[in-house]
Amino acid sequence: MCPRHPEPVPLAHPLPVLKEALEKVDQILRQAMSAPGVAAMSAVVIHNDTVLWTGNFGKKNGSDPASGAPNEYTMYRISSISKIFPVLMLYRLWEEGIVASLDDPLERYASTFTINNPLGLASAEQQGLILRRMASQLSGLPRRLRSTSLLWKGSTQEALNLLKDDVLVVDPGTRCHYSTLAFSLLAHVLAAHTAQGDYQRWVSENVLEPLGMADTGFDLTPDVRARLAAGFYGSGRPAPLYDLGWYRPSGQMYSTAADLAKLAVALLGGGPRRLLRPDAAKTLLAPLLACPGAYFANETGTPWEFHAQRGYRVVRKDGDLDGYAATFSLVPPLRLGLVLLLAGPRPPGPDLVARAYDELLPALERALREAEPGPAPPPTAHPFAGYFTFANLTFYEVRAGPAGELRLRQFGPRVEALVPPAFRTLALRHLHGRVFQLHVAHEFPCALPLGDAWLSLEAQHGQLVNFYPLDHHGLSPGFDVPGLNTYRVLRLRGKPVFKT
């Protein structure tokens, strides 16, 4: 059925259908607290710029029987969710012109960078390792620098020196391969081209402070440690708080459910502050390449993993680090977001976030379809009402509906023989002036059989109808539907009569 995605119209909360879905999400997460090592959990669901629900479970410190429950301001390590921030830096520098193109080679910003690519064609080597691929899982770089752990304390120049004798494990842009190295290298290289000259300072001044994310950062100070939910391994043993050194951009950060909700709202285009222009934000949230079945996601993007679920692309960034697990996820067509933070390992079995979306997606879709407003009427229907024809092949009647809205009815012997009555009449939603928008229905078949062909209702839905300037009688002499390549649909003096 179409439209495949409902319009993300404002909703008047609370709605029973959403309340029921959120209660089921609460139950799913509450039951997951019985998994080994999971001590605390905080979650938040966002729609548009509104927090629909928060859930907090367990104890902030699972080792202390007297510990209180966490809340949306409890800090957790967010591990690979940190990778979102180097990508935001890349896109902002691109908007500001410091980065000329997302497809610039890394060498343009790190002149001493070189690495062997034994799997690539000679003609492709010159543009293989581009910034866009560095910001996704398409760089082909190894997971980490040779002979280093996540605790390595070296410099970016030392990293570049190590890469000279290393090899790409995948030809860039050809296959999804997870690399922590790529995001840390991207962050440190780009930071050298900013006024701050320091990655962490740039993130604080350009992302965290503007969004009011005061409880998000990098340094595990005594105050931060006191507010962190205590992390545990699956065995129940407390996990240490490692400092990731040079790899900090890829996994060092801590945050709260409340702060990550602010980031989700900004990326969905809501709230008072936007991080990126709409065109850049759309590029940021688009997939780059489908991943093979063995990979853990359907598609990769910058820096996202995309998972297909119930007809939607769920945009996700998951992170797992000793004692902690986290997921930041968005469904842009619905302007829906879900953040999940755990002190403890990710529970085994069916994915918690996917189970939550199994409840949220159909509920929100239903709520949006039911809340969709009727077609807006024009100030007066008179200039547009009447009979029209396209080359004496198809015939239309435009008339006012009960609420003053315009309706476009297609008629004639052939139409009446082939098209069901319910789909011969489309609403015309008034936009401004003489421009209207075709609206089939809240829900309809995407296509109908039409003799030996098919009539695409999906193609008609949402198309603009541009009526001509009014004549001296105050009537529009016709209209065009440019999106359907239909021009010169002209007014008739009266209702046509068809010979049988």
From Swiss-Prot:
This is Putative beta-lactamase-like 1. InterPro entries: Beta-lactam-related (IPR001466), Beta-lactam/transpept-like (IPR012338), Beta-lactamase-like_AB/R (IPR051478). Disulfide bonds: none annotated. Pfam families: Beta-lactamase. Belongs to the beta-lactamase family. It comes from the Eukaryota. Coiled coil: none annotated.
